[in-house]
Amino acid sequence: MATGDLKRSLRNLEQVLRLLNYPEEVDCVGLIKGDPAASLPIISYSFTSYSPYVTELIMESNVELIAKNDLRFIDAVYKLLRDQFNYKPILTKKQFIQCGFAEWKIQIVCDILNCVMKKHKELSSLQKIPSQQRKKISSGKSEPSLSNEKISAEAVGVDTSGRFVTSGKKKAVVIRHLYNEDNVEISEDTLSPITGVNEAVDVSDLNATEIKMPEVKVPEIKAEQQDINVNPEITALQTMLAECQEKLKELTLIEKRLDCLEQKMKGNVMVDENTWTNLLSRVTLLETEMLLSKKNDEYVEFNEINEDCASCSNMDLLNPHRKNKVGRPASIPLSSRYSTASSDSTPRASTINYCGLNEISEETTIQKMERMKKMFEETAELLKCPNHYL
């Protein structure tokens, strides 16, 4: 797109905005880029703040232009242009929202502003006609009374206090805000001589006041919109604060419980179940080993004692036999055969009986050892099982 065409369209837009008395700054860079954010404020000002007549027409058509996003705002604007202004833009709604089409968008904005100004003139002229007709009727009634009474050419006015005021000027000035004090009645004939210049001044004053009123209302509406937008954020923050306070309370309770547990558990040692079971199994094994070692020691001592006793008994048996053999030819009679036989028989029997006891004790110790082995095997099997608790 040529830069000359853009500059020409921007100049046209500046001229129209001067006629429209646009108070805010224009984003020329955004308009050149085709950014819709630069043109939407101008359109909203033309429809809502420029003319009270146009705003009344929009309110009567039940179209809302405030508190909407860009897409809904453009939908409402296109509907107004179609129904009330008989204007169809060159671009579609999607094209207008997108970036680009700068020259076409500037042209559409200029056309919208011209349509609004034209509609303002039409509506203002329609409201001026009935007021002028009323003034003509009132002036027609006052002319014969003035000719009959031959009132001088001095202008007659009415002060706010209700009294008649005369001035040296030829043109009359009527103050509109009239009220009666002390039941003073004022005739309509005295208020009739009003010139066309005064009418123009009054209409311009009315237009100025009516145009200024929406400018005062717009900030109020914006403030309400901001409050509406801020209220959900405030509620969300309040909920977050309440949740944080609840969590802080829970943390304080947990800290108190931990302190109580620390005080109760002072001097106590915490051990895991698995480690405790392992310790118990090891202790049982050690106890069994100690018992087995003691029994083995006793068995060894017992065997040593038996061996000592056996050796002593054998020595005793051998010594008297030799003595008997040596002393027999000298001093032993024949009758002593029975006694020697009896004396020889007793220690042999005792040795035999003692050997039988040794065999019995060995058998009992072997059985005990077998039982202990079984106990060890059972404990080993129990320790292999992980789910078993002693």
Swiss-Prot record:
Annotated compartments: Cytoplasm, Cytoskeleton, Microtubule organizing center, Centrosome; Cytoplasm, Cytoskeleton, Microtubule organizing center, Centrosome, Centriole; Cytoplasm, Cytoskeleton, Spindle pole; Midbody
Region described as Disordered: 323-347
Pfam families: CEP44 (PF15007)
Modified residues (Phosphothreonine): 346
Keyword Cytoplasm: yes
Alphabetized UniProt keyword annotations: Coiled coil, Cytoplasm, Cytoskeleton, Phosphoprotein
Any one Gene Ontology BP term: centriole replication
Signal peptide as annotated in the record: none
Region described as Binds with microtubules and centrioles: 11-195
Segments forming a coiled coil: 233-267, 361-385
Bias kind Low complexity: ranges: 335-345
InterPro entries xref list: CEP44 (IPR033603), CEP44_CC (IPR029157)
GO CC list: centriole; centrosome; cytoplasm; midbody; spindle pole
Keyword Transmembrane helix on entry: no
Modified residue annotations for Phosphoserine: 331, 345
Gene Ontology molecular function: any one: microtubule binding
Entry-linked PANTHER family: CENTROSOMAL PROTEIN OF 44 KDA (PTHR31477:SF1)
Task performed by this protein: Centriole-enriched microtubule-binding protein involved in centriole biogenesis. In collaboration with CEP295 and POC1B, is required for the centriole-to-centrosome conversion by ensuring the formation of bona fide centriole wall. Functions as a linker component that maintains centrosome cohesion. Associates with CROCC and regulates its stability and localization to the centrosome.
Subunit structure: Interacts with CROCC. Interacts with POC1B; the interaction is direct and recruits POC1B to centriolar microtubules. Binds to centriolar microtubules.
Protein name per the record: Centrosomal protein of 44 kDa
Species: Macaca fascicularis (Crab-eating macaque)
